[in-house]
Amino acid sequence: MSKWRKKQLQEIAFLRPTETLKKGDIAPNIPMANIKEFQRDVVKIDYSEFRGGTKFRNGDTLLAKITPCLENGKTAFVNCLQEDEIGFGSTEFIVLRAKENIDERFLYYLSISPEFRKQAISLMEGTSGRKRVNENALKISDFLIPDFEEQRKIANILSAIDDKIQINNQINQELEAMAKTLYDYWFVQFDFPDQNGKPYKSSGGKMVYHPELKREIPEGWGVESVGNLLDKVTKAEKIENNLIEFIGEIPVIDQSQKYIAGFTNNENGLIQPQKGHVIFGDHTRVVKYINFDYARGADGTQVLISKNEHIFKE
């Protein structure tokens, strides 16, 4: 293992490197909304008229500098542009470009490391709700850096993990689409398999009108209040967004699209399901099934358990 040396950020990276785009040019645009929390790749590119903003190219890192985007982990590695293409984005990005003998992917992984994030967040200034990182202070901050060969090895390993995560996310999206289709067949079209394996309603299954729902439902089905079927877990401390770490002992589950929001070492937030919990976002309506020890995120993350003998319990 090489010796790690302490270097200022400005020694290893250009901050806001100079690029040229003419006002009025149509160019790739990456707004803040197109960067997801703790996700390496940009979600999508928009093409629009350049009127101002930060400019970047492939290999650069986009680091959100404003609250709560920085605390929430909005940092991305640009690899979605054409060769020699210049893109632009929010003025709330700090653009990092690797200098000589610095692996550009290593620079990205450095920027999402707990040490870097903690330092950047500590340098935020301004009024509550509109705080921004002091870039002049950030660029003279010290970080431990290995030699180029070890940087590349570290980046290769972490990139392979991110590639695997991306594949798993795609698989999850396909499975979710299948689950929605299955739900539609069962509970909207009522074409679940009958005793002969045929679609119930399409095969002449008996339907009865339900006055409360003002529609027909399969014979034998009933209507029940959600409150009579499910209960909420209120115990355990909730983990605020700005306290969620990139690395830790306990995974944090919140109501975002991301399955695991991050990690914490706060054991007061630990929840240990016997078999599994359903997580429901009362803002996002995102639903997750969790069957491992975890901590709950704050701001609308609900933990649901069954209180009805006919519904699977933890």
Language model features with spans:
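Non-catalytic DNA-recognition/assembly elements of restriction-modification systems
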Residues: 1-20, 144, 148-153, 159-185, ...
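A short glycine-rich beta-alpha junction/loop motif
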Residues: 2, 85-94, 125-155, 294-302
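Short beta-strand/loop turn elements enriched in aromatics
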Residues: 14-36
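Short, basic/aromatic beta-hairpin or loop at an interaction surface
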Residues: 28-43, 84-87, 251-254
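Short alpha-helix capping/helix-loop boundary micro-motifs
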Residues: 41-51
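Short, solvent-exposed loop/turn positions at domain surfaces
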Residues: 49-50, 127, 266
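A short beta-sheet element
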Residues: 53-54, 58-113, 258-314
